[in-house]
Amino acid sequence: MREELVWIDCEMTGLDLGPDKLIEIAALVTDADLNILGDGVDVVIHADDAALSSMVDVVADMHSRSGLTEEVRASTVDMATAEAMVLDYIGEHVKQPKTAPLAGNSIATDRSFIARDMPALDAFLHYRMIDVSSIKELCRRWYPRIYFGQPPKGLAHRALADIHESIRELQYYRRTAFVPQPGPTTSEITAVVADLQGVDDAPEATDSAQERPSG
């Protein structure tokens, strides 16, 4: 099995595999140390007005505020073309099929839509998946200090931005959770977050496991 990870995030009109549509897909490949390889790919897929008007209010508002809805209307890219674009990028860095796991946050939902709409992409990926949200849930139970100290999450709700956040989140857990017991102090956690956010001087932190994250 190769060391690369294929990070994918999808935006849909909803979460129901029956009627809902895949309208944006982005992909980034990283090496085993989570260094991004290449520029990645981000594709907005056309959907008709009937599909867009069927979105529930919270999803419609989210995609309207992010600008995705208008981009979907204007897009001329169909599903097959989008799949080919994603595979072309992944193929630049992952040469053999079924060798690179799919990675992301709550990635099973994304993979369900990929399996439905992009079977060649689904078949190219290894069956194993690395779900950052699983690590988050374990830290909440085993290392609450790490969980409550995690970097704030943005609210872009766009595929490529969400992938960058997921990679940064796994970098955070790698540097704070995947260390010998009892794990890092709150001050060490704060320093990791500051480094990942590009902040020179980390603020002082109280060594508490109860302070909730800001995002």
UniProtKB/Swiss-Prot annotation:
It holds the Pfam family RNase_T. Its main location: cytoplasm. Disulfide bonds: none annotated. InterPro entries: Exonuclease_RNaseT/DNA_pol3, Oligoribonuclease, RNaseH-like_sf, RNaseH_sf. The active site is at Y127. SMART domains: EXOIII. Keywords: Cytoplasm, Exonuclease, Hydrolase, Nuclease. GO terms for molecular function: 3'-5'-RNA exonuclease activity; nucleic acid binding. Residues 5-170 form the Exonuclease domain. It is an enzyme of class 3 (hydrolase). NCBIfam families: PRK05359.1 (NF003765). 3'-to-5' exoribonuclease specific for small oligoribonucleotides. Belongs to the oligoribonuclease family. This is Oligoribonuclease. It comes from Mycobacterium ulcerans (strain Agy99).
